[in-house]
């Protein structure tokens, strides 16, 4: 005997009842049985008097004597939703919240009998005696089809709301209080149960047979797909790109050609010859020099979080490599590490890289991607601007060596005001956001509206702020030509590509 379950919920006073509906293999509607285990002889006698659903008068006459709302906690371990999708196909979904198992049933003959049963009940004399009109919260929809949400969203919402009810049940319901007119289970089934708790969603993974489904909880829908898909950041696109193919295409959107943010490791791989990367000062980590006070979390805890998230020790990677066989010193900032903010360690690593390039007569390339100086280190982070600029003065003016700065999106604040704009050649990526102060800060300070696009690379290029705008595809070749133009050549002439 296969069983399918449904909730019969009547929001009249304190009446709540769950019954089970047995379905035989020949799709005939069997007797209605009470699933409650109760030793009350009066109630057991009542249950024995319930006959087949075809004997509707006998069944309906006994409904209002079945179960009090105080026993509701005994009935909410499983549930079934009757759903109709956008194609008008009907489904019954049963789930056991303890085992987190779902069963999907689209047996049309059985569902037709269920539908007939509920509609006949809805039109019965019991319902027409004023109960529906007197109870403002009564609402039962056999097939709840929310036009504002998709099929999956509605199922997720119902499941989410139901599981929330397993954790936190209104105390007035548990205590049998008279203030129980707002039938929370009825609201949940009818799609009125409110928002999901803490933004959590539930995903249904279907087995091959299409009947059994398993519930899986995740903190966010995006978490399920972030390792597979990347959304374009362009406000005119927002296209979705497959992550594996995106890496091979240099993080350039397939739909609109927008240059997405890149991890520092990916950019290093893009910029230099394979197998030539030699990192420097990897063991340098940030402390808390000013014991920064924060209501949210400690500065050290934030550093630890981003170290685990990115696998980096700081917001920049510095080292040496070869550019088509030409030895270079290169530093690449990573915006994923605290917004690429420049603190004491970032400033020290850049300064040491410049000094190494000065002593070894190497061309220098710095890739900027930063929100500016790190506020958690106060004036110590601002001091890095002067320290780096001083080292660059010796490198450029005294040693007459060649420095290229590459501005990617975003480059703002103290980085823009220091080494970002000190390159002998300043290269910008297409559509890069380049500014000293952000748009919102300027508007709040000057009480003026900033035109759209006034801080984009293309607009600033026409104002003479930097030299070329170079896409990522030819960037390595352009850098190689610039370096050779300034007198730096490959160690092995055969390595020129």
From Swiss-Prot:
HAMAP family xrefs: AcetylCoA_CT_beta
UniProt keyword annotation of Plastid present: yes
Domain called CoA carboxyltransferase N-terminal: residue spans: 230-497
Reaction(s) the record says it catalyses: N(6)-carboxybiotinyl-L-lysyl-[protein] + acetyl-CoA = N(6)-biotinyl-L-lysyl-[protein] + malonyl-CoA
Short name of one Pfam family: Carboxyl_trans
Region: Disordered, residue numbers: 30-50
Compartments, as annotated in UniProt: Plastid, Chloroplast stroma
NCBIfam families, per the entry: accD (TIGR00515)
Summary of subunit composition and partner proteins: Acetyl-CoA carboxylase is a heterohexamer composed of biotin carboxyl carrier protein, biotin carboxylase and 2 subunits each of ACCase subunit alpha and ACCase plastid-coded subunit beta (accD).
Residue ranges that the Swiss-Prot or TrEMBL entry lists as coiled coil: none
The protein, known as: Acetyl-coenzyme A carboxylase carboxyl transferase subunit beta, chloroplastic
Name of encoding gene: accD
Record keyword DNA repair present: no
Cofactor detail note: Binds 1 zinc ion per subunit.
Family of this protein: Belongs to the AccD/PCCB family.
Any one GO molecular function term: zinc ion binding
Start-end of Basic and acidic residues biased regions: 40-50
Keywords associated with the record: ATP-binding, Chloroplast, Fatty acid biosynthesis, Fatty acid metabolism, Lipid biosynthesis, Lipid metabolism, Metal-binding, Nucleotide-binding, Plastid, Transferase, Zinc, Zinc-finger
